């Protein structure tokens, strides 16, 4: 890829105003390969987006090039930062080309959602403007898509694939349904290619019940730890059943703290690691604050790269996003600190955090839209066994046939080592990715790229 440095030349600035207030801001780089901006999705609520046009794009009117909308987890983590620079974007946090960028298979649209994540913001730090539910987050994203797609023929002719990681999966399911409704009512012009759920927090109850047995099986918990874990999981189940969702979120934190203590701080994103291996070490305290959970989500990825041969200022995502990237973009408010409000976003959605969306996945499948699930073998927080448990609760008419299907092995290029398995029936697809934790594109970039190509049906390079 030609891009080895961040583009600095800006060709155009388009600002549309109402009553003297800036509503939408858009910028494009010198060769048109990147565009970014803000959309005011609600009064005083501004959502940031960044679109990369793929240099591998094949112009074929009969088969339009796909575009991927990437949604991060948290809620409160930044897709523009984490998903882009640490996972699938064209450059890594050292601003070096990423060989496994998903631009090889599709255009990429990163969004900081919900508002308050990353570069997105509310005016005057009015916390009551943060969304409180997955439905509200999906509504904001639908408004953003209307602004970006309705008047852009290139975009609205491309199939849009909503790809989500972790908590982003809950919002992605709601967004898929919202997009279908908006398209059918004539409010949105786009073609929904599918919804892809990567290690997604679809059914919190099923996941918390999976943690104890999984960690006992891999020797990170003993019988005492298993019993304690299952006891708190039962409490969470009761709280969810009674609609006590805030209480369930608090008990979820208690359960993570308990498991951390009993397992000598197993990493919830990869059970082969300790959290003490991360830059954010939790070994000094058994009490994990919400903001530390959000920071840990990103800093886990920082730790996957060796920083020993570079200066401390290089490779750090916080410094990158608040430094050279903020300077490049030119439209970020001067007083905005990237990622500074992630905890406020999480707190606002505390009552939504433990709500399941299995019924919404059922509804999505019933529309005929392709739903793809992928899961890393080594993940704990959104474990494969937990994912399989909620999938088996689906009421979709094709579930029994799906369960009967044989899996096919996955390989990476000429390497014949088994990298995973997949199976499909009608519009439900599942990928089991071996050797990967919570962040599949980071741990197994080659097979992840192959998977994305299969999902989007992109031309072979």
Swiss-Prot record:
Alphabetic keyword roster: Carboxypeptidase, Glycoprotein, Hydrolase, Protease, Secreted, Signal
One function term, GO molecular function aspect: serine-type carboxypeptidase activity
Top EC class of this enzyme: hydrolase
Residues with attached carbohydrate: 99, 152, 340
Active-site residues per Swiss-Prot or TrEMBL entry: 166, 379, 438
CC per GO annotation: extracellular region
Name under which the protein is recorded: Serine carboxypeptidase-like 51
Compartments (UniProt record): Secreted
Gene: SCPL51
Originating organism: Arabidopsis thaliana (Mouse-ear cress)
Its job: Probable carboxypeptidase.
Tissue localization of expression: Expressed in seedlings, roots, flowers and siliques.
């Amino acid at each position: 890829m030609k891009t080895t440095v961040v583009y600095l030349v800006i060709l155009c600035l388009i600002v549309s105003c109402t009553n003297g207030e800036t509503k939408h801001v858009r910028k494009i780089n010198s060769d048109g390969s990147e565009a970014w901006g803000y959309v005011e999705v609600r009064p005083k609520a501004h959502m940031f987006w960044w679109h990369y046009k793929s240099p591998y794009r094949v112009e074929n009117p009969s088969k339009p090039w796909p575009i991927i909308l990437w949604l991060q987890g948290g809620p409160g983590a930044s897709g523009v930062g984490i998903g882009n620079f640490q996972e699938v974007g064209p450059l890594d946090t050292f601003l070096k080309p990423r060989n496994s960028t998903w631009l090889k298979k599709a255009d990429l649209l990163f969004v900081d959602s919900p508002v308050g994540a990353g570069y997105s913001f509310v005016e005057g730090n009015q916390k009551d403007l943060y969304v409180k539910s997955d439905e509200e987050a999906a509504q904001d994203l639908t408004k953003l898509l209307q602004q970006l797609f309705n008047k852009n023929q290139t975009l609205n002719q491309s199939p849009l694939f909503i790809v989500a990681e972790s908590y982003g999966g809950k919002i992605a399911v709601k967004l898929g349904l919202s997009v279908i409704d908006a398209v059918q009512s004539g409010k949105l012009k786009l073609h929904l290619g599918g919804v892809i759920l990567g290690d997604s927090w679809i059914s919190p109850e099923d996941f918390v019940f999976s943690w104890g047995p999984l960690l006992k099986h891999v020797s990170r918990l003993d019988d005492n730890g298993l019993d304690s874990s299952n006891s708190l999981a039962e409490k969470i189940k009761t709280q969810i059943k009674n609609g006590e969702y805030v209480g369930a979120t608090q008990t979820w934190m208690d359960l993570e703290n308990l498991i951390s203590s009993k397992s000598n701080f197993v990493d919830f994103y990869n059970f082969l690691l300790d959290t003490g291996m991360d830059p954010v070490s939790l070994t000094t305290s058994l009490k994990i604050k919400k903001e530390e959970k959000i920071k840990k989500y990103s800093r886990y990825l920082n730790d996957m790269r060796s920083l020993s041969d570079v200066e401390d200022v290089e490779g750090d995502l916080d410094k990158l996003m608040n430094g050279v990237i903020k300077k490049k973009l030119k439209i970020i408010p001067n007083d905005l600190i990237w990622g500074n409000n992630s905890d406020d976003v999480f707190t606002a959605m505390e009552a939504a955090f433990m709500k399941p969306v299995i019924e919404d996945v059922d509804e999505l499948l019933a529309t005929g839209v392709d739903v793809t699930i992928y899961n890393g073998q080594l993940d704990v927080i959104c474990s494969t066994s937990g994912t399989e448990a909620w999938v088996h609760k689906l009421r979709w008419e094709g579930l029994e046939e799906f369960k009967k299907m044989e899996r096919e092995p996955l390989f990476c290029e000429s390497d014949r080592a088994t990298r995973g398995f997949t199976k499909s029936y009608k519009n439900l697809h599942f990928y089991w990715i071996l050797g990967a934790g919570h962040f599949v594109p980071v741990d197994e970039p080659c097979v992840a790229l192959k998977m994305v190509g299969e999902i989007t049906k992109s031309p072979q390079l």
